[in-house]
Amino acid sequence: MPSRGRLFDLSATRNDEALGGDYNYTTLEMKFLSFHQLHERFVLGLRVEYAMVEDDPPFYAVPWVSMRGIPALRYQGKQVVVAEAEGRFNFNENWAAVGFYGRGWTDTNLPATDTEQDIEAYGVGARWRALKSQDVWVGLDFARGPEDDVYYIQVGHAW
């Protein structure tokens, strides 16, 4: 699992009937991840994602708030923002505990327009390094969202 470093990813796509597609729409997605080792045993991870779609996309291409504890495709909009933080405490080289909190917004309630209906989720989890030679971690997370409590089995990092 990452303990330091940053990742920035930006992508834009165009789907067009003139190019053989079934729909006409454009997407833009931005992701920023940052990991900070604050102590020998503690790592802070930060995540910000933005996605937008223009024109007339099918329902499955409309961006949605994607976080542990939030059902997929539940909160969709032409613009979506997600911000999440995860703290990880390493007990030893093979076991760790995580805690996470995140908020999401769709174009109907982006922070600049309305913060009364922020979509938030939080939870805790445990990690075990299953393969030392490949640095593969397996985990179990418990997340609470606005609707349900959910368990997740993770292989690798959740982001």
Segments and roles (model prediction):
Residues 31-33, 84-86, 125-127, 139-141, ...:
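Outer-membrane beta-barrel architecture
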Residues 97-100, 136-142:
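Conserved active-site loop/cleft motifs that coordinate metal ions or position small ligands
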Residues 1-93, 97-109:
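C-terminal outer-membrane beta-barrel translocator/porin domains of Gram-negative envelope proteins
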Residues 123-133, 147-159:
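Outer-membrane beta-barrel "beta-signal"
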Residues 108-118:
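Small/polar, glycine/serine/threonine/aspartate-rich low-complexity segments that form flexible
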Residues 88, 92, 106, 128-136, ...:
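Hydrophobic alpha-helical segments
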Residues 53, 143-147:
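Short, surface-exposed acidic/glycine-rich loop or hinge patches that mediate macromolecular interfaces
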Residues 25-29, 80-82, 119-123, 137, ...:
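Transmembrane beta-barrel architecture of outer-membrane proteins
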